[in-house]
Amino acid sequence: MTATDVALFPFADYWWFYLAFTAAVLLLLVLDLGLFHRKAHTVSFTEAGTWTFVWAAMAMAFCFGLYQYSLWAFPQDPRLMAIPGFNTAAAAKQVALEFLTGYVLEESLSVDNMFVFVVVFGFFGIPQQYQHRVLFFGIIGALLFRAIFIALGSALLHFQWMILVFGGILIVTGIKMMFSSDEAIDPETNKILRLVKRFLPITNTLHGSHFFHIENGKRYGTPLLLCLVFLEMTDILFAVDSVPAIFGVTQEPLIVFSSNIFAILGLRSLFFLLAGAVHLFHLLKYGLSVVLIFVGLKMAWLNSFFNGHFPILLSLAIILGVIGASIVLSLVFPKKPDEEPAV
């Protein structure tokens, strides 16, 4: 038996963590909407930058806390102490690096998704002062769907052949992303939105920050609601790629869940920070495609060259290097005006 055969954080022993972590996240979200963003307003660049730093700092603090907790808890776990040659310090370091790598990977993939946010907000005519509210409730939905996807992914990975399937999905997704053209996004053709309109009348005008509007005793949905539904559907499709990608970094559900949630929490402020400049990163999709292909190859093939576990520090370096290079090259070689995608 080796360390890779044993779960470091089995759900039976750490169910309390999931409850406490989820409760803490919900509390943060309540404070965010009820205290810091009670009134609808346009999020300034300074405010977005401050909150981006705050969420990132909280993620790093959690990473450090997880490292310290691992140093304390692992020696008290008889399952781990029964593993020949188990090194507590090395295992704790591995946990911290896996969290950090998963967080960076999810945040990087989210940047590519921001272009969709910009287009959708523009399509539905959502003013900047109401965009935070849409993203707030969108993230609550994203947290729920991610939890479901992560639970399913964790259950499926008990079958070893599913690792190859996940790896194959990431490789195919990466290749498709690399060679796909930038197509115009048209929410009007979305089947889910058509279904919503069939069962719920929709107004053509906004009614403040409300998702619903009652007129003559009849309930109507507003464009804000349609925008929220479309973003939720987009996030579900996004999760199909991102969740397997993080399972390519670590197969510990606790690390996958926490790193994923922290990345999502920082997504709103990161959106307002980068929304005006996201179109500049035109080479980012190629960097992300390389990262997805790399993670897929790691799951399906490369791990076998390293006793079943590709070095996490090398994984982090490759992901940061590729993403950083694609961003820098995008700025050094800007896209020509006639190459801008239609929106």
Where are these regions (language model features)?
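Multi-pass alpha-helical transmembrane bundle typical of ion/small-solute transporters
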Residues: 1-343
